[in-house]
Amino acid sequence: MELQVVGANALTVSETTFGREFNEALIHQVVVAYAAGARQGSRAQKTRAEVSGSGKKPWRQKGTGRARSGDIKSPIWRSGGTTFAAKPQDHSQKVNKKMYRGAIKSILSELVRQERLVVVEKFEVEAPKTKFLVQKLKDLALNDALIITASLDENLFLAARNLYKVDVRDVQGIDPVSLIAFDKVVITTDAVKQIEEMLA
């Protein structure tokens, strides 16, 4: 199959990478797993065993007229422990390479079908200035875009830092969440070739 390149000849690409069927269930699973892996999972609360304080019985069991009490660290007391205390945990989910690559291929194929993938020969700015990048995006009628290059261009990266709806990645930095988060994905021809090799 062929991808149209802005201002150049069409680029021949593999149908297994850019012409794959849309697999919503697989994409959902991989995106959820990716987001779960980004969770910090470090929250921690103290149980009644961990709260600082005496284990002494505050008053005798009977005869005071007050409710019976075993220690001041009871969860129903102010400053007591938490009943079901949250503990640090690993939220990551296992996704094998075949599934991950399949999801990326499925997303790229859907971007092609929806005409959200914009292929260019190269994408550069002459200096790390936001105004140069804004003008370049305006020329392509874009304002919400993920830009993928074969290797990370420092000028381009610095120029994009101040733009809310623009992100710059190299091929190694792409992930399923960023691919579906933007209206358009701008990709260079060199990056397309690298992605094909990476997902082969």
Curated annotation (Swiss-Prot):
It comes from the Bacteria. GO terms for molecular function: rRNA binding; structural constituent of ribosome. SUPFAM superfamilies: Ribosomal protein L4 (SSF52166). Pfam families: Ribosomal_L4. The keyword RNA-binding applies. Keywords: Ribonucleoprotein, Ribosomal protein, RNA-binding, rRNA-binding. This is Large ribosomal subunit protein uL4. GO terms for biological process: translation. Part of the 50S ribosomal subunit. InterPro entries: Ribosomal_uL4 (IPR002136), Ribosomal_uL4-like (IPR013005), Ribosomal_uL4_dom_sf (IPR023574). Belongs to the universal ribosomal protein uL4 family. One of the primary rRNA binding proteins, this protein initially binds near the 5'-end of the 23S rRNA. It is important during the early stages of 50S assembly. It makes multiple contacts with different domains of the 23S rRNA in the assembled 50S subunit and ribosome. Forms part of the polypeptide exit tunnel. Disulfide bonds: none annotated. One of its GO terms (cellular component) is ribosome. Residues 43-72 are annotated as: Disordered.
